[in-house]
């Protein structure tokens, strides 16, 4: 069983948990207390010198960065390639969505909400505009689409649903974006591990209360 270092409130950690559920892999979950500095202990730095979560250790093989872990789990343990198809064009679209999630959508969340939550900084209206812009892009990607990349559930949907659900508990109005809202309501029903994802979201929500 693979060791999985995580926090339940973390969106990237939740995307890995849902992917593992989708491919039927059980994770040996190890909570890492970042506030206590557990990620900076020598034993963890040996595993991941970048000292980030999520981190997976599968039979001695250590990997971090959630989207890399998602792809690894599907390629190693998936009974089919449906979550990350081998077709170069299908895979390219999935990769684009994953990079969009990492570099644009979730980054906009971090830039706007993290300073407020962790540094008690005032809200930055310019950073909020970046969130709105990211959702407008996602809304366009999802025009006429039931799924984020192709005609079935993929790791792109799983990564994006982890992010979008985090926006929801932060109080962002997803319903303003009709295509995103429709996709999200469906994703809640069809994504394996959604319940655990939502429980983690509610943990994260405590930072906003």
Swiss-Prot record:
GO biological process, one term: glutathione metabolic process
Coiled-coil annotated residue ranges, if any: none
Its EC number(s): 2.5.1.18, 4.5.1.1
Catalytic activity: RX + glutathione = an S-substituted glutathione + a halide anion + H(+); 1,1,1-trichloro-2,2-bis(4-chlorophenyl)ethane = 1,1-dichloro-2,2-bis(4-chlorophenyl)ethylene + chloride + H(+)
Signal peptide start-end: none
Family annotation (PROSITE patterns): GST_CTER, GST_NTER
The entry's keywords: Lyase, Transferase
Residue span, GST N-terminal domain: 1-81
Domain GST C-terminal intervals: 87-209
PANTHER family, sorted: GLUTATHIONE S TRANSFERASE D10, ISOFORM A-RELATED (PTHR43969:SF9)
Function: Conjugation of reduced glutathione to a wide number of exogenous and endogenous hydrophobic electrophiles. Has DDT dehydrochlorinase activity.
Subunit structure: Homodimer.
Identification of the protein by name: Glutathione S-transferase 1-1
Native organism taxonomy: Eukaryota, Metazoa, Ecdysozoa, Arthropoda, Hexapoda
Gene name of the encoded protein: GstD1
């Amino acid at each position: 069983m693979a060791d999985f270092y995580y926090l339940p409130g973390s969106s990237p950690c939740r995307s890995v948990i849902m992917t593992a559920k989708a491919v039927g892999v059980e994770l040996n979950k190890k909570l890492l207390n970042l506030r206590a500095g557990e990620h900076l202990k020598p034993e963890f730095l040996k595993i991941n010198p970048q000292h980030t979560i999520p981190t997976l250790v599968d039979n001695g093989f250590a990997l971090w960065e959630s989207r890399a872990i998602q792809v690894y789990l599907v390629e190693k343990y998936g009974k089919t390639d449906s979550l990350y198809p081998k077709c170069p064009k299908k895979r390219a679209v999935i990769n684009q969505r994953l990079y969009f999630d990492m570099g644009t959508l979730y980054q906009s969340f971090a830039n706007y909400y993290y300073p407020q939550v962790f540094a008690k900084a005032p809200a930055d209206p310019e950073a909020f505009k970046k969130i709105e812009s990211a959702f407008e892009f996602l809304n366009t990607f999802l025009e006429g689409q039931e799924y984020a990349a192709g005609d079935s559930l993929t790791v792109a949907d799983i990564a994006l649903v982890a992010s979008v659900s985090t926006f929801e508990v932060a109080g962002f109005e997803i319903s303003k974006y009709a295509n995103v809202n429709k996709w999200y309501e469906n994703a809640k029903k069809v994504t394996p591990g959604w319940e655990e994802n939502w429980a983690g979201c509610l943990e994260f929500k405590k930072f906003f209360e």
